[in-house]
Structures are given as structure tokens and as C-alpha cells.
Amino acid sequence: QTLQTSSQSQFHGLKFSHASSFKSPSAPLRKNSIFAKVTKGSTPPPFTLKDQEGRPVSLSKFKGKPVVVYFYPADETPGCTKQACAFRDSYEKFKKAGAEVVGISGDSSESHKAFAKKYKLPFTLLSDEGNKVRKEWGVPSDLFGTLPGRETYVLDKNGVVQLVYNNQFQPEKHIDETLKLLQSLK
């Protein structure tokens, strides 16, 4: 007999609505869940995803200027909200460095629109429903694959990765590290 509940819980920035959201810790770990495919010095795979307004946005749109691409687990969760607001609060510093900021999660465009409006986020949020881009970039998962990873990439004006930063539990550190790198690119 199986008992199912529809309870929701949160764990370090990820919403779980069903017990089936969890993968067994004994499940074999895939190589790409541990090691990033996109590394410093590489050119990441191109993508086109919908933004918070439902418009398609391609990575190639940002060529010619540095871009900060940050992957985060989910909208409206404590760690992700803290990280997004930290990017918002430092947004002028990113603009002064000539950089664009782009956040990517598996949430829908509608969720991103509400999230951006609620927290007055001035940058682009992209919907990677199904986590295709996350997988192509090799963004690692945490906690035996149960938690989508939090990883930040800084691409230079030529689209080459200059920084890969991963810190699941201190989201605000992503801003400090990316700004340091952007200052060194000037």
C-alpha cells in the first residue's frame, strides 16, 4: 500500500511538492552531476530560452560584452531569493563593468515574471523547463542529485568562460566573486 501526500517543503532554496521529487541517495551518480562540462577557458553550448515576458533570448545576444549567467534552483525560495536580490542590489556595479546578468532556473516564464516583479529584479530571467541547458552546461546537482545546483559563470565579451563559481549554501558569495572577476577584465 502506497501513501502519497501533497505536502510542500523547502530545503536550501528548492521547493519540493511531492516525495517523488527526491531521487534515492543510493542511485548511481552520473558523471555530469559531479563535473561541469563548461569550464574556465571553454565556450559554453549556445541556447535559446524564454525570458520572463515569454520572449526567446539567445546566449549569442550577449556577445560583445561580458555576461554573468547564474543557474539557481527555484524562484521564491529563501536562498534563491537572497541571491537574486543580491544581484539586484549590485546591478549598477555590473552595468558599470559593462556586464549583463542572466538568471536561469527550471521555473516557467510566468513564475519568473511574478518573481521579477515582486523583488524588482532589473535583469533577465530565463526559463529552462526540463533543465536541458542546465544539463548541457553540466551544472552539478547537490545532495545526491536531489537539488539543482547553484552555479555562476562569467563569460567575457568573446563568449569564453572566465569564471565558474559554485556555492550552494552561500548564494551572496556569487556576487562578490563575479564582481571581482569583472573588475580584472577591465
UniProtKB/Swiss-Prot annotation:
<dbReference type="GO" id="GO:0009535">
    <property type="term" value="C:chloroplast thylakoid membrane"/>
</dbReference>
<keyword id="KW-0934">Plastid</keyword>
<feature type="disulfide bond" description="Redox-active">
    <location>
        <begin position="80"/>
        <end position="85"/>
    </location>
</feature>
<keyword id="KW-0793">Thylakoid</keyword>
<keyword id="KW-0809">Transit peptide</keyword>
<keyword id="KW-0150">Chloroplast</keyword>
<dbReference type="InterPro" id="IPR000866">
    <property type="entry name" value="AhpC/TSA"/>
</dbReference>
<protein>
    <recommendedName>
        <fullName>Peroxiredoxin Q, chloroplastic</fullName>
        <ecNumber>1.11.1.24</ecNumber>
    </recommendedName>
</protein>
<keyword id="KW-1015">Disulfide bond</keyword>
<feature type="active site" description="Cysteine sulfenic acid (-SOH) intermediate">
    <location>
        <position position="80"/>
    </location>
</feature>
<keyword id="KW-0560">Oxidoreductase</keyword>
<dbReference type="GO" id="GO:0009543">
    <property type="term" value="C:chloroplast thylakoid lumen"/>
</dbReference>
<keyword id="KW-0575">Peroxidase</keyword>
<dbReference type="GO" id="GO:0034599">
    <property type="term" value="P:cellular response to oxidative stress"/>
</dbReference>
<dbReference type="GO" id="GO:0008379">
    <property type="term" value="F:thioredoxin peroxidase activity"/>
</dbReference>
<feature type="region of interest" description="Disordered">
    <location>
        <begin position="33"/>
        <end position="55"/>
    </location>
</feature>
<comment type="subunit">
    <text>Monomer.</text>
</comment>
<keyword id="KW-0676">Redox-active center</keyword>
<dbReference type="Pfam" id="PF00578">
    <property type="entry name" value="AhpC-TSA"/>
</dbReference>
<comment type="function">
    <text>Thiol-specific peroxidase that catalyzes the reduction of hydrogen peroxide and organic hydroperoxides to water and alcohols, respectively. Plays a role in cell protection against oxidative stress by detoxifying peroxides.</text>
</comment>
<feature type="transit peptide" description="Chloroplast">
    <location>
        <begin position="1"/>
        <end position="36"/>
    </location>
</feature>
<dbReference type="InterPro" id="IPR050924">
    <property type="entry name" value="Peroxiredoxin_BCP/PrxQ"/>
</dbReference>
<comment type="similarity">
    <text>Belongs to the peroxiredoxin family. BCP/PrxQ subfamily.</text>
</comment>
<dbReference type="GO" id="GO:0045454">
    <property type="term" value="P:cell redox homeostasis"/>
</dbReference>
<keyword id="KW-0049">Antioxidant</keyword>
<dbReference type="InterPro" id="IPR013766">
    <property type="entry name" value="Thioredoxin_domain"/>
</dbReference>
<feature type="domain" description="Thioredoxin">
    <location>
        <begin position="38"/>
        <end position="186"/>
    </location>
</feature>
<dbReference type="InterPro" id="IPR036249">
    <property type="entry name" value="Thioredoxin-like_sf"/>
</dbReference>
